[in-house]
Amino acid sequence: ASCETTVTSGDTMTYSTRSISVPASCAEFTVNFEHKGHMPKTGMGHNWVLAKSADVGDVAKEGAHAGADNNFVTPGDKRVIAFTPIIGGGEKTSVKFKVSALSKDEAYTYFCSYPGHFSMMRGTLKLEE
């Protein structure tokens, strides 16, 4: 089982994949995130944020107010399982999180917290046996 995946985006509000499966056998899971576009992060910046599906609306709404310096994620938000910085065209980043933070009975959503991107840039993540 692979304990990492790569998600890409570009100068549109889309992710390259709509779903991610995390093997339960992994201790940690890494998401490599690449922006293959050309626009700067101030114009079309993206990130990858993971939370329980039930929480994402509030996490995104509150994160938008946290500002660019905080990558549009509220500092210390316990509902956020993992997130990457906001990146622009040609940049890449990654985030690693403990698989023990996930439950197989829970639904998770990953999304971009850049203001206005949340409704289109999202996907599902699930823990697999």
Swiss-Prot record:
Disulfide bonds join C3-C26. SUPFAM superfamilies: Cupredoxins. One of its GO terms (cellular component) is periplasmic space. Its main location: periplasm. Pfam families: Copper-bind. It comes from the Bacteria. PROSITE patterns: COPPER_BLUE (PS00196). Induction: Produced during growth on methylamine. GO terms for molecular function: copper ion binding; electron transfer activity. Keywords: Copper, Disulfide bond, Electron transport, Metal-binding, Periplasm, Transport. Residues 1-129 form the Plastocyanin-like domain. It is found in: Periplasm. NCBIfam families: azurin. PANTHER family: AURACYANIN-B (PTHR38439), OUTER MEMBRANE PROTEIN H.8 (PTHR38439:SF2). This methylothroph organism uses azurin in the oxidation of methylamine. Iso-2 is probably the acceptor of electrons from methylamine dehydrogenase. This is Azurin iso-2. The lineage of its organism: Bacteria, Pseudomonadati, Pseudomonadota, Gammaproteobacteria, Methylococcales.
